[in-house]
Amino acid sequence: MANKTIKHLNHFSRRFSFVGLACQHHIQLNHTLLGQVIKPGDVVIDATVGKGNDSLFLSRVLSGRTGKLYGFDIQQVAIDNTRRMLQDNLSTADKMDQVSLSVRNHKTFPEEIQPRSVKAIVYNLGYLPGQSSDKSIKTEAADTVESITNALELVSKGGLVSIMCYRGHDGGKEEAEEVEKVMAKLCPREWKVFSHDPLNQPTSPVLVTVFKK
């Protein structure tokens, strides 16, 4: 039995790095929290669509035809990837009518989105993953802080802002620290703030979640 367990653990360690496990755990936790908050008909925002995985999850949660997903990214390739991801995986084509994708910096939001009208805003910071992506194009701490400040004005009661911070690349650790500084200053009577951080893995991703009371 012990030999089988060791063999299984060795196989497990070859397949997954600890950083990868932390990332997958955070993604699962993030989606669980979002799924508990979002209801049919809500407005949600994916502020940095990347490869489209969060946008796909949000689109699936928005059952019915009255909800709305806004998705943004600074790179056209990310918008194209996300649109393709949604078209290939959504069960019905008419769900695309609920989706608005556009190329823009995440630090500002369209004026049509009214204050206190959004149930969830999702961030996946850093650069666009993939072997062919330009790793020099990434989110910047100053833009992210401005974006989060604006996002907090949009979130409705009972809503959630989630920020996945990646600390392993150049500038990532500093960006994560700036995010946590902003969140730590929020009024506890209005907000519940959590940092989900593997304490013994300083370069692993950290998930920051902010709930509007």
Feature roles, as predicted:
Residues 2-43, 47-61, 80-116:
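S-adenosyl-L-methionine
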Residues 147, 154, 158-165:
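Conserved beta-strand signature within the Rossmann-like core of class I S-adenosyl-L-methionine
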Residues 169-213:
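Class I S-adenosyl-L-methionine
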